[in-house]
């Protein structure tokens, strides 16, 4: 965690040997090389911003069956869920809006975020996730629009040769079947293939009908099918490349929305079809490395009444295509690294998407420069980026950080950064659209101290985020009329005591509307997260505790919607696994152990106590 002497020199050595790779999750060494913070490979210990990595082994140990269940355990994260698996989930980082979180898949932003403004994590199959890199704080100076609260990078590439088969069952008719293999086709060629099918009957997610929709006392289930295929090729010692494709088809049932235009229909079914293709080439020689990636994704998102079908006039369709081109270069310079590159993105939507009457295309070109240097006991880090958005014009953001190891194993950190979010297509051209909207802008100050005290590795951070020109809906149109001010403090710690490993996060945020001084909705001011792991007689046990403080929401069953308070809650999860043989492992989980009844979105129930059983065979 703490910077050591010559840390950045070792970073450079590792990078030069391994090659810089933004989108590939190549085999990581024990010093946990990551790429998301500054778009070049570096050990976590050299990163000044708060950073968390979740590995596939941890996901298996937690036995998470959704991406939301993985992320809710992480520092600074708050999840507002409209029910169980597959139901809409909103991700808040450090109290910022869900649209202020940049979600990447293998370093490339998700397709639908440019339309709705935020990424719907509920639709990403958890079997697709092999690693998650998560950084808190502004990162627009590295990635451009959306990265106000933080960045989530979901990495899909598998890291281990071999084959794995998984079968699971659980409450509410849950079942999942998963298979993956990674094999060497030739000396320098590796093929990876994976598939998954997941289904749950679900449960009735609406608690009391207080959602402004129609009460439907039925099960709200979910089904997902996923395929992944990739090839990695090493051409020589300097050049390598990859090509991959993956896609998933999902079907989700929910309680009906009101369709004012076609009152005969009750849209309560969602079908999502997502396809993604990308390829890249990497070059590495001496102090220089480079990577070029191109990608294409296509998403179709239907909402309809099954009685009339998805092609009925009462149905809706969000149909979007996205093209990306990324070129990044990294240089060893003095006692550190400099990275520079260009991103290009083109997003096209068909007429009718998000109620936009005509097809639209937007383009964004970004140029960035990041650098990190070590000067004795100091680490200096900086980044600057300019984006040219075809609708929002030019936006330039920057950030700077300083770390000082004032005594051995203790470091002080200070940082400042700016960030922005461009208006979405629906805000500019949909119902109530305003093509004169300006980007939302933020300024964040952060200070922290981290250290190793005996067996305890810890960090405490305080931050302040001011966001202006927030886009809000008023008088039947979108305007830049909102402001928010967020203050927070978080403490994270990790310690081993005998056979027990403890991880603890304590966080407090004060997210307020600067105009009204009201607490922003669906954010808990206090959270405590605790993970306890231990091994006893070959059984691996895990106990998870989470406390969510009270939060506010809106009751949309009234007009105008009134503000309501949701109570706080504490809940536990228990997991256990046992290696029957060196190939076969059996895992079991009890989620919401004490069967707590609570809501993170007003009117939508979180599942009660649930049971899961999984078998994994690896060879």
UniProtKB/Swiss-Prot annotation:
Positions that bind Ca(2+) 2: 218, 220, 254-255, 268
Ranges spanned by the short sequence motif TonB box, renumbered to the chain: 31-38
Gene designation per UniProt: btuB
Record flagged with keyword Transmembrane: yes
Gene3D superfamilies in the record: TonB-dependent receptor, beta-barrel domain (2.40.170.20), TonB-dependent receptor, plug domain (2.170.130.10)
GO cellular component: cell outer membrane; pore complex
UniProt name for this protein: Vitamin B12 transporter BtuB
Function: Involved in the active translocation of vitamin B12 (cyanocobalamin) across the outer membrane to the periplasmic space. It derives its energy for transport by interacting with the trans-periplasmic membrane protein TonB.
CDD domains xref list: ligand_gated_channel
Annotated TBDR plug domain residues: 43-157
Species whose genome carries this gene: Photorhabdus laumondii subsp. laumondii (strain DSM 15139 / CIP 105565 / TT01) (Photorhabdus luminescens subsp. laumondii)
Membrane-related topology note: Multi-pass membrane protein
Residues of the signal peptide: 1-25
């Amino acid at each position: 965690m703490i910077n050591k002497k010559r840390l950045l020199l070792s970073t450079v050595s590792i990078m030069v040997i391994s090659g810089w790779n933004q989108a590939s999750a190549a085999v990581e060494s024990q010093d946990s090389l990551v790429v998301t913070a500054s778009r070049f490979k570096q050990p976590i210990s050299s990163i000044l911003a708060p950073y968390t990595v979740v590995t596939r082994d941890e996901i298996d140990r937690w036995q998470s069956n959704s991406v939301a269940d993985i992320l809710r355990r992480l520092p600074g994260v708050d999840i507002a869920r409209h029910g169980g698996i597959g139901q809409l989930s909103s991700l808040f980082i450090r109290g910022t809006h869900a649209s202020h979180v940049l979600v990447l898949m293998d370093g490339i932003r998700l397709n639908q975020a440019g339309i709705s403004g935020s990424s719907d994590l509920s639709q990403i199959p958890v079997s697709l996730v092999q690693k998650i890199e998560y950084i808190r704080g502004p990162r627009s100076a590295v990635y451009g629009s959306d990265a106000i609260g933080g960045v989530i990078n979901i990495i899909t590439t598998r890291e281990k040769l071999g084959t794995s088969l998984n079968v699971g069952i659980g409450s509410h008719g849950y079942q999942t079947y998963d298979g993956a293999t990674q094999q060497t086709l030739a000396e320098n060629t590796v093929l990876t293939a994976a598939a998954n099918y997941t289904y749950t009957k679900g449960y009735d997610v609406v608690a009391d009908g207080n959602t402004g929709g129609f009460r439907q006392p039925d099960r709200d289930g979910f089904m997902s099918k996923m395929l992944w295929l990739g090839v990695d090729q090493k051409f020589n010692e300097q050049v390598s490349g990859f090509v991959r494709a993956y896609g998933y088809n999902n079907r989700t049932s929910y309680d009906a929305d009101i369709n004012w235009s076609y009152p005969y229909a009750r849209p309560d079914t969602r079908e999502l079809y997502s396809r993604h293709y990308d390829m890249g080439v990497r070059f590495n020689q001496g102090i220089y490395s480079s990577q070029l990636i191109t990608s294409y994704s296509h998403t179709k998102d239907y909402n309809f009444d099954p009685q009339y079908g998805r092609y009925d006039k009462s149905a809706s369709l969000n149909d979007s295509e996205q093209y990306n081109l990324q070129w990044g270069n990294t240089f060893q310079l003095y006692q550190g690294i400099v990275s520079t590159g260009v991103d290009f993105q083109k997003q096209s939507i068909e007429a009718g998407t998000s109620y936009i009457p005509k097809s639209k295309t937007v383009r964004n070109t970004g140029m960035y420069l990041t650098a990190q240097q070590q000067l004795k006991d100091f680490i200096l880090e900086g980044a600057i980026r300019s984006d040219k958005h075809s609708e929002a014009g030019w936006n330039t953001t920057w950030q700077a950080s300083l770390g000082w190891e004032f005594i051995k194993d203790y470091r002080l950190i200070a940082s400042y950064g700016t960030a922005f979010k461009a208006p979405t297509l629906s805000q500019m051209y949909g119902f109530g659209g305003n093509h004169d909207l300006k980007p939302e802008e933020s300024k964040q100050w952060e200070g922290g101290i981290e250290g190793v005290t005996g067996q305890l590795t810890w960090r405490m951070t305080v931050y302040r985020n001011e966001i202006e020109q927030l886009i809000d809906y008023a008088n039947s149109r979108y305007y830049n009329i909102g402001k928010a001010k967020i203050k927070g403090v978080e403490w994270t710690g990790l310690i081993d005591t005998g056979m027990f490993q403890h991880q603890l996060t304590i966080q407090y945020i004060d997210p307020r509307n600067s105009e009204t001084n009201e607490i922003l909705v669906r954010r808990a001011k206090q959270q405590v997260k605790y993970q306890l792991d231990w091994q006893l007689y070959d059984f691996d046990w895990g106990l998870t505790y989470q406390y969510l403080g009270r939060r506010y929401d809106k009751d949309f069953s009234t007009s105008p919607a009134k503000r309501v308070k949701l109570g706080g809650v504490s809940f536990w999860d228990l997991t256990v696994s046992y290696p029957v043989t060196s190939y076969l492992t059996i895992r079991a989980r009890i989620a919401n152990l004490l069967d707590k009844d609570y809501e993170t979105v007003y009117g939508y129930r979180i599942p009660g106590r649930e049971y899961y059983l999984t078998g994994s065979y690896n060879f």
